[in-house]
């Protein structure tokens, strides 16, 4: 689940062959305004590829729990981690991401995290079929909000 961005929508189209369910939210009012006024970006955007009902955090969490993989599609210029990365760690879900900087983190494991190119996303069958490799609790705990606050207060 993610907010509509042109790059995210295009990535969803490129990933259709893998038959993933990728939810992209868009405000229905602005969608129709952009379609009526024929914004170029919306020329090929189909209503059926979007979700117009917002989900609360509980619904999003429920969807993530029932998923085998989570998609982390970062903004083009983003370098840091998104909430989706932490969700995948806590829920022990495999992560498919466009963020190549994730390799530098101690929790990175190519068995659990697949880095894709947004222009030509290729997802190996082996990645999809292999089991999630548990990350040590010690590593996960250091990314908990309580730990971040503790580190800030110590500085």
Regions from the PLM with identified roles:
Residues 1-78, 82, 98-102, 145-155:
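Nucleotide-sugar donor-binding catalytic core of glycosyltransferases
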Residues 14-15, 47-48, 70, 90, ...:
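Pol beta-like nucleotidyltransferase catalytic core
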């Amino acid at each position: 689940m993610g907010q509509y961005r042109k790059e995210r929508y295009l990535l969803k189209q490129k990933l259709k062959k893998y038959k993933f369910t990728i939810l992209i939210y868009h405000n229905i009012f602005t969608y129709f305004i952009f379609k009526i006024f024929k914004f170029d970006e919306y020329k090929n955007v189909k209503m059926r590829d979007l979700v117009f009902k917002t989900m609360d955090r509980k619904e999003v969490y429920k969807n993530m729990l029932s998923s085998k993989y989570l998609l982390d599609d970062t903004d083009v210029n983003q370098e840091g981690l998104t909430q989706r990365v932490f969700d995948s760690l806590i829920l022990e879900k495999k992560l498919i991401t466009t963020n190549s900087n994730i390799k530098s983190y101690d929790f990175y494991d190519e068995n659990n995290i697949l880095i894709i190119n947004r222009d030509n996303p290729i997802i190996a069958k082996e990645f999809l079929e292999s089991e999630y490799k548990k990350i040590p609790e010690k590593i996960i705990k250091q990314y908990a909000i309580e730990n971040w606050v503790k580190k800030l207060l110590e500085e």
